[in-house]
């Protein structure tokens, strides 16, 4: 039997936009002996709530739990408002401020006329209020409307819970649709999936079928089509799918046979409702099609803005060269000039070609030619990158502030929306985005919407690296469209032409490996190793790494030579068990003080982002369990609620490493990795190494990866749209 407590809500301790609440509750009654000590005292409670009114009476159902830090708390599973029954309580309730225009004297008059069942009487027969002298029609409407709204909302939330939605999901649904919730539920329950990011198709589908919906209901097929297109495009990076593909995925998702007529009818309805767009047998989610179209149109607009002319341009660039004590090659000079004269510029190049040097020069040129102070420069220019580590790296290189695109757009993790958007644009005049190959279509569309139409853009990246995790391949499409201002940096910058690491990167990209590369060199060491001895060889090299700066980059987590196994082994080399180091086991994995870990998701409130690497400084493993991680001077506290947001980082995935650089990199290469061996992946891994690179494993695996350049070719239409929108510029 669930425990229940009846009492008064006293105050909020914490309240999130998602409806999660921590608060104080004064207990008056309980059905649980363990809670008797709290009668006439307050207890801390947690749970998801629609709305709570201070000093109102509620009935909470749930359980008494022991929090590792804060002691006994009541975890609320469901709740209901208790309408006051006593005369004084009813007067207090009606005059609480919840009912606008109803003061204490008016409340006393109402209760005096209607008696102890005042609230029930108002709900069931509001016309009785007309019998009370001095009560206005406006007050009657307020009383009836407010009581009805509150009663309806609670009944709706409870009914959603009875169907199988969690309290959190029920609140998300009600907060989205309010009084229309029941209508939407009856008309098309699948709109809950379509409209609310946190609610999954599978959850809604399970509840719909359980509630008696026919397996071939057109509303179900429509939702499955939207789910299929979204999931597959996110997985493979496509902008669109073909009809036959969608049909196959939908049948797999629904686990039912549907006729081609039923499928076609659903497609037609989705087109009519503008939820999908069909162009020449290509089927897009409307949001994706509009994102590509917006990007192409904005690029076209920027290309049409007249060039900026300045007689001081050449002399100012010469001044910039003097400032940095360097001379730029012709490609670099071209990029620097175009960054000023043009309103959109793409700069691409491989490792060692001076992309970061160009960004520094562009910023300095903009400052000097516009006669800006450092403070004014930072107000007018925004240096952005897709990841926290990449933004930190560009900030260190330029001595200017930089941040992630999400941070710049003021991403709200509660509703997954940006505060900087088409309705509230940023005031910056110039935006430079580094590591642009990692930016997906939706994110770039959001960035453009958050900028003024005349904001200058410089986009910098290496399009031979891995594309974005999300859909699209924007940098590649922009370059291959031949429609934009593009500068390709080819000449190796300064002394880096002597780097064997960079030579290997270019050989990989050209699919022409020189056998001499397998001879051991100072900065590049290939160690042929049988598959069963790769991890042992990694440990051997790690024991010689006295500086503890080596970073292992691997393609996948599982298998004998996967990231998880390598991390387990390397922990004992770099951070062995010690009586002086406290430990904590999380999901079967031991974490100890001084462990190197990687952040797996964004925590913008803590200024820590996906891919950031830190060191565990403190662990508390007593009645309270906490882990403190230092990210380059920013110490973040983790509790059990977010322990899943980090992993060991002695070995990390190549995808997670993108946007970062390491002095020493070790890449295990075994045929065991299968489909994860492909050119762009290995090229990206190799280009993470600054000073030293180890390749450990099978030569045949390296050769297989280099020859495999056809993995997951992405289907997009941005290239064609750019050509169409810019053809007459």
Where are these regions (language model features)?
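P-loop (Walker A) phosphate-binding loop of NTP-binding proteins
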Residues: 339, 350, 386
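Conserved helicase motor core of P-loop NTPases
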Residues: 355, 374, 463-606, 617
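C-terminal accessory regions
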Residues: 612-729
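Hydrophobic anchor at the beta1->P-loop junction of P-loop NTPases
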Residues: 347, 383
